[in-house]
Amino acid sequence: MAFYLGIDIGTSASKGVLIDDRCNIVCQASCGHETDNPRDGWYQHDAEAVWWGDFCRLSRELVVRSGVNAAQIGCVGLSALGCDCVPVDTECNALAPAILYGVDARSKPQIDELLSEYGPDRARELFGHDPCSSDIAPKILWFKENMPEVHERAAKFLTASSFLCAKLMGRFTVDRYLAEDFLPLYDRYTWKVDARECDRFCRPDQMAEVMSATDIAGVITQRAAEATGLVAGTPVLVGTGDSGAEAISTGVFRPGDMMVQLGSTAYFIYLADHMVDDARLWPGTFIIPGTYGICAGTNTAGALTSWLRQELYRDAVEAEGHGGPDAYSVMAHDAADVAPGADGLLCLPYFAGERTPLNDPEARGVFFGLTGRHTRAHMVRAALEGVAYTVASHVDIIEREHGLPIGRIMLVGGGTKNPIWMQAIADVCGREVSVAKVTVGACFGDAIMAALAGGAYASWDELAQVLGVAQTIVPDMTAHELYASRRHIFDELYTRNRDLMHELV
C-alpha cells in the first residue's frame, strides 16, 4: 500500500496529514508558531524557523507516530499561506524576514507610487485588479527601496510554498494559481517571465519557473531527506497556496462551487468556467485545468475572535489554563445566548484594514450601537455577524452583479468549530452552507493531490467520489430578514466613515 503526505504552513499554525490510497487519514499532526509584528502594519515570518522548521518537524512526527515506512510514501504535497514574499540566495537560504500577505501594509507607499505612475486603468490591466497589499510585486519593490543590498543579492523572490519546494528538491518553481499574485511580472497567458515589466521591480532571473500545482517538481534530495525524515528520491509536487489546497480538500472542483475558508482571515474561492473581470476581486486561473477562480479575502475572521478572547475573556483564558473549558467554547456559548442581530450592535471587522472588496489597508474596526445593556457576549455575537456580512457581500458580487450561479457553499477552517458562526453565515446570506466530511484543511487537500499525482486516482472526477459532505446548515429566514434590513447600515458605516478612518492613520 502507498501513502501520501500533505503539509500546510499557515499564519499561526501548521498542519500535516498522512493518508492511504483511499484517502483515509492514517495520522495527523500540528504545531503552532509566532507571527512577528515588529511595527504597526508589519507582519512577517522567519522563513527558516517557521516555514522550513515546521515542515521538518511535522514530516518527522507523522512518519514516527504513524509507524509507516517512509519509503512507502509515494508522493509529497505541500501548501502554505500565499501572497507572501521572501528573498533567498542560490541555496534557498532566506535573506530577510518574509513579508506576509495582505495583512502586512508596509508596501502601501509602493502601491500608491505604482498607481500614480501607471494610472488606475493601466494598473488594473497589469495586476488584474486594483493593486493591493496582497500583491507580491509591490513587496519586491519595497525590498528594492528599503533593503537594496538584500534585493541585489537575492537569487529569487519566493512565496512560501515555492520556498518549501526548493528546500525539498532544489528547484525554484511556483504554480500558476500563486503566480497570479506576482502579476505583472509574468505574462498571464504564456506564464513566462515578462522581462519588460520586471524592469521596474527586479531582474527577470529572480523569478521562479511557473508550473502546475499538481506537477511533480522533482524528488527529495539527500540533504532534505536528512532534515525531514523522508526518503531521498520521493516525488514532490510543485505545491500551491493554502486557500487553493483547502478548496480542494472540501471537494470544490466544479464551476459553481464556492469555498469560504474561516481561518485567521477569511478567504473565498468561487469556481467558474471562464475568466471573470472584476478589479475589486482577484480573478485568475485555478488549480484544476479548465477552471478559473474568483478569489477574494478579508483581513480578519478568526483573528478577531482571538483578539476578543485575549482582551475580553481573560478570565476564561485563565480558567482554561487551570483545566477549565476552552475559552473559545465559552465565547460561543455566550454568543448563543444572544439573539440574532445582537440587540442592535453591529461590528465592522476591519481590525487590520480590509482586502476585498474594499481594498483599503487603512479601514478600521468599529463596534456601532453600543449601549449600557450590551455585554461582552453581544460583542462576540456582533463580531461573528460582521464577518458573516463580509461573506454575504462577496456572494452578492458573484451572483447579483456577475450573474453567476452558486451551486453550493462549502465552509472550512477553524471557524467550522463554532456552530453559531456557521449559522450566522447561513442566515445573513439566506442560503444553505455545508461542511465537508473531512475538515482537516489544506494539508488534506495537499495529500489528496499527491494521491492523484501519484497514480492512486485516474482523474479529478474519480477523486471526487471519495469526498463527501458531513453537515448542511439551513438558514433561518426570519433571522435573514432581520439581517437584510440592517445590511445597508453595515455597508454605510464604512462608506460614511472611510475618510475619518484614514485621518486616524
What are these regions (language model features)?
Residues L5-G6, L115-G128, P138-T173, L183-F201, ...:
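Active-site core segments that coordinate phosphate-bearing ligands/cofactors
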Residues G32, Y101-G102, N299:
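A generic structural motif
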Residues V86-V88, P109-E113, E246-I248:
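Pocket-flanking alpha-helical
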Residues L100-E117, A447-I448:
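Short alpha-helix plus adjacent loop in nuclease-associated cores
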